[in-house]
């Protein structure tokens, strides 16, 4: 199931306006709606979710950024919730994020879709591709045969992230075993809320 863009609401991150939502009972959300709400709540904590933004606004934000800089915004296409806008060697470009059957993946042509990795959250999807780009990239490459390489390296934040969040990112980059650290339980709970490196 691909969710469609609904009416605007003011529930975006850091004062941004979001346009996505889910249908269903207001009393008891379905497991699907609860899963989606959790994933979108997680996204709102990143600092690089911009909410409602046009293609041209995204291009303007990324125009002077280095290659690999990206942001997440609400999709302007009614069949998708979100879009990655990223600066490539050919300039800013956009890639839709598909949500289907409780999973997120990059939009692609049909013959490739089944091979693309799927994730429970948008942040996990982005974290995976950022780590993959770190592992594979050694430096800028010139595009061959008209192809443009897509690298996700650095998020473009809506504003300076809180120091707490930056510390959490650093800890996540250094260890995968939060519960083994000599820290108070409350702090470990905070670290567990966001287990990603980006």
UniProtKB/Swiss-Prot annotation:
Gene encoding the protein: SOCS2
Biological-process GO terms, alphabetical: cell surface receptor signaling pathway via JAK-STAT; cytokine-mediated signaling pathway; growth hormone receptor signaling pathway; intracellular signal transduction; lactation; mammary gland alveolus development; negative regulation of growth hormone receptor signaling pathway; negative regulation of multicellular organism growth
Molecular function per GO: cytokine receptor binding; growth hormone receptor binding; insulin-like growth factor receptor binding; phosphorylation-dependent protein binding; ubiquitin-like ligase-substrate adaptor activity
Name of the molecule in the record: Suppressor of cytokine signaling 2
Domain of life, per lineage: Eukaryota
Region of interest (Disordered), ranges: 1-31
Domain called SOCS box: residue spans: 151-197
Keywords linked to the UniProt accession: Cytoplasm, Growth regulation, Isopeptide bond, Phosphoprotein, SH2 domain, Signal transduction inhibitor, Ubl conjugation, Ubl conjugation pathway
Pfam family for this entry, one: SH2
Gene3D superfamilies: SH2 domain, SOCS box
Subunit structure: Substrate-recognition component of the ECS(SOCS2) complex, composed of SOCS2, CUL5, ELOB, ELOC and RNF7/RBX2. Interacts with IGF1R. Interacts with DCUN1D1.
Major localization listed first in the record, in broad terms: cytoplasm
SH2 domain location: 48-156
List of residues that carry Phosphoserine: 30, 52
Domain comment quoted from the record: The SOCS box domain mediates the interaction with the Elongin BC complex, an adapter module in different E3 ubiquitin ligase complexes.
């Amino acid at each position: 199931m691909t969710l469609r863009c609904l009416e605007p609401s003011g529930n975006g991150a850091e004062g941004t306006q979001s346009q996505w939502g889910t249908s269903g009972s207001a009393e008891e959300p379905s497991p699907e709606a609860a899963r989606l709400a959790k994933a979108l709540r997680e996204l709102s904590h990143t600092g690089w979710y911009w909410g409602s933004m046009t293609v041209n606004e995204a291009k303007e934000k990324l125009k002077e950024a280095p290659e690999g800089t990206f942001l997440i915004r609400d999709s302007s296409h009614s069949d998708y919730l979100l879009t990655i806008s990223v600066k490539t060697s050919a300039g800013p470009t956009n890639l839709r994020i598909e949500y289907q059957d409780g999973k997120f993946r990059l939009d692609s042509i049909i013959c490739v879709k089944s091979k693309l990795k799927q994730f429970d959250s948008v942040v996990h999807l982005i974290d995976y591709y950022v780590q993959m780009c770190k592992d594979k990239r050694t430096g800028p490459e010139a595009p061959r045969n008209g192809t443009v390489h897509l690298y996700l390296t650095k998020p473009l934040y809506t504003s300076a992230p809180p120091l707490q969040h930056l510390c959490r990112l650093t800890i996540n980059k250094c260890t995968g075993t939060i519960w083994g650290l000599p820290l108070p339980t409350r702090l470990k709970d905070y670290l567990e809320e966001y287990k990603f490196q980006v």
